[in-house]
């Protein structure tokens, strides 16, 4: 089983493991909800120039891509009641976003049902996966490691529970459902990219003909987070890989995980930065500040003052490729209207609520410390052979590890 099939299979198991009855619970009150999901992503490759990075991103994305961090935004509006025949909604934005005066919020078109494939006869074959799991920042492997997860020696349910690990509080953003109007951005009409210099700071106004007016302001603490910037990466796949990063001013904590695949044994190697035994699959997305604080106390998430970590020596020595996934958790902005009256005897009911959540993520291919030397070598390739560029070599590595996270 190749690495991508293994990753897809593990992801399917985790999807089931992370489901909980609370995720399907209906809100007690018909409250209009508006979620703003903010993210900054940065891919870093030690030793590569901006020109090579641009070429690599172009190969990966199939188009010419700019170098540097990428900002993304997801807007989701959910209002009680069925939408009118001609629904309209928009989010008026501050000038600092540099994206015009407003962003249209559209109701998604219903997808036509796809005729299912003919069911296959017989019982599906149980996937064969053997995973070596390590944890903790440090130059050497900790005691009792690795933990071996083998589907040949454990049930699928036990494997799923072992891989699920910790998760944050259930987050259920607005989504299409019966009896509710749902609109979103980006959408089929507007899919513009968020400029690198875009800022959310300022006043925001959400309005439409199927939801109440929503007005709120965003301050600097809840603006786009600074990108993940690795300031130092030392060590090859056979070594202890030490990495440092620039502190993100608005981060509430950090978490890192790395994954690779042994070419010798076919085993998947997984590592996380947690001091406690924690795979980390459930921690690579948005987390509320209360969850981040709890995980810091449990020594699972690194505190906001931490700026360095190390992967133990030799755990990826037989890997054909490995990658580090990194996340900085951001603060949340939660606003509800109208405000509660001081007198508790006065009846009160919220009309709308806004949640703005934030994260900054980074991806770092590991074991590329020799790329600079390869670029500066004077050895000429055999006649007739076109030398493989560092970007092409890196693309092969990324093709192996894409989809893991």
At which residue positions do the language-model features occur?
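Bacterial N-terminal signal peptides
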Residues: 8-18
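Boundary at the C-terminal end of the N-terminal hydrophobic targeting segment
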Residues: 22-27
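Solvent-exposed N-terminal domain segments of exported/luminal and surface proteins
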Residues: 30-187
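Short, aromatic- and glycine-rich surface loops/edge beta-strands on solvent-exposed regions
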Residues: 190-214, 319-333
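Proline/serine/threonine-rich low-complexity linkers at boundaries of modular beta-sandwich domains
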Residues: 213-225
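Structural beta-strand segments of beta-rich domains
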Residues: 239-243
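Hydrophilic extracytoplasmic domains
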Residues: 249-252, 262-405
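Short beta-strand elements bearing conserved aromatic residues within extracellular beta-rich modules
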Residues: 254-256
């Amino acid at each position: 089983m190749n690495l991508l099939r293994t990753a897809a299979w593990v992801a399917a198991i985790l999807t089931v493991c992370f489901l909980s009855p609370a995720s399907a619970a209906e809100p007690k009150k018909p409250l209009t909800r508006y979620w703003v999901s903010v993210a900054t992503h940065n891919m870093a490759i030690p030793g590569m120039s901006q020109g090579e990075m641009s070429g690599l991103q172009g190969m990966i994305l199939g188009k010419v891509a700019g170098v540097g961090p990428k900002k993304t935004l997801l807007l989701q509006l959910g209002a009680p009641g069925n939408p009118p025949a001609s629904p309209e909604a928009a989010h008026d934005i501050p000038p600092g976003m540099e994206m015009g005066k407003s962003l249209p919020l559209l109701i998604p078109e219903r997808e036509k049902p796809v005729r299912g494939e003919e069911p296959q006869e017989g019982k599906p074959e149980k996937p064969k996966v053997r995973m070596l799991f390590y944890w903790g920042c440090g130059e050497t492997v900790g005691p009792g490691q690795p933990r071996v997860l083998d589907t040949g020696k454990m049930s699928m349910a036990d494997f799923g529970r072992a891989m699920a690990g910790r998760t944050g509080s259930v987050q259920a953003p607005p989504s299409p459902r019966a009896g509710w109007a749902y609109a979103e951005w980006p959408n089929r009409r507007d899919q513009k990219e968020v400029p690198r210099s875009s800022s959310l700071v300022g006043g925001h106004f959400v309005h439409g003909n199927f939801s109440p007016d929503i007005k709120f302001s965003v301050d600097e603490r809840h603006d786009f987070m600074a990108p993940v910037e690795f300031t130092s990466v030392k060590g090859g796949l056979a070594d202890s890989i030490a990495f440092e990063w620039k502190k993100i001013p608005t981060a509430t904590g950090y978490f890192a995980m790395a994954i690779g695949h042994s070419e010798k044994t076919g085993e998947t190697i997984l590592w996380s930065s947690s001091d406690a035994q924690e795979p980390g699959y459930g921690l690579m997305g948005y987390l509320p500040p209360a969850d981040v604080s709890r995980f810091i106390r449990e020594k699972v998430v690194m505190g906001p003052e931490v700026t360095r970590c190390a992967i133990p020596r030799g755990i990826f020595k037989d890997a054909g490729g490995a990658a580090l996934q990194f996340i900085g958790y951001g603060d949340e902005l939660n606003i509800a209207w109208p405000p509660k009256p001081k007198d508790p005897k006065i009846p009160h009911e919220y009309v709308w609520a806004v949640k703005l959540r934030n994260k900054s993520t980074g991806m770092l291919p590991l074991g590329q410390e020799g790329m600079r030397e390869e670029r500066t070598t004077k050895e000429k390739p055999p006649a007739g052979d076109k030398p493989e560029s560092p970007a092409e070599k890196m693309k092969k590595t990324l093709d192996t590890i894409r989809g893991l996270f």
